[in-house]
Amino acid sequence: MRKKSSTPNRGFRVADQIQRDLTELIARELKDPRVGMVTVQSVEVTPDYAHAKIYFSVLVGDPKECEIALNQAAGFLRNGLFKRLMTHTVPTLHFHFDQTTERAADLNALIAKAVSSRAQDD
């Protein structure tokens, strides 16, 4: 029988702390010109804290270039997390561009198009 974790929300708390610390590290210490104004949208940590998927959005600049730059700076950012987090291990960071906003805009456009065509039919 599997033992229940005494702190079931620990993974969420660690992910939340990583999100806050990464936001600060990227804004203040990362000097790569390819990384513009980045917003860390969410962090997903594996149960063993070995890997973390970081989803981000970019206000200005090319998302693909920014993703490459962030993945190249993952070691530097992980080192910064070592100094800030009070955990035994710090996960390996994997950055992914969050396409949720683009998908939402596309869906809104499709809905608006369907509503306008339905209004013309009536």
Curated annotation (Swiss-Prot):
Q: Does the keyword Cytoplasm apply?
A: yes
Q: Which GO terms describe its cellular component?
A: cytosol
Q: Which residues cross the membrane?
A: none
Q: Name one GO molecular function term.
A: ribosomal small subunit binding
List the protein's name.
Ribosome-binding factor A
Biological source species: Polaromonas naphthalenivorans (strain CJ2)
What this protein is reported to do is described as:
One of several proteins that assist in the late maturation steps of the functional core of the 30S ribosomal subunit. Associates with free 30S ribosomal subunits (but not with 30S subunits that are part of 70S ribosomes or polysomes). Required for efficient processing of 16S rRNA. May interact with the 5'-terminal helix region of 16S rRNA.
Task: Give the primary localization class.
Answer: cytoplasm
